[in-house]
């Protein structure tokens, strides 16, 4: 079966094994097939939450995002990470190969 829909009491479930699965709703929850772990929860006009191994790690807020745990940022070929201070000033943060850290106004 490529696509299944079933209802279990208070909730409706969908299982897709081929192609895109496009879902619309005011609250969308994605979880393991056996519901043992959550992946993503989306709530209209509210937070989007992303989970890792059952623990909330990334959440959108009205002012930005909240990251729980470590955040690893790779810069690729760019020249650092740009951070904005509370007063709106932007700073470029660069970590050199030898581990030295430098900042400069953008």
Where are the language model's segments positioned?
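Self-maturation zones of extracellular/virion spikes and adhesins
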Residues: 1-56, 64-106
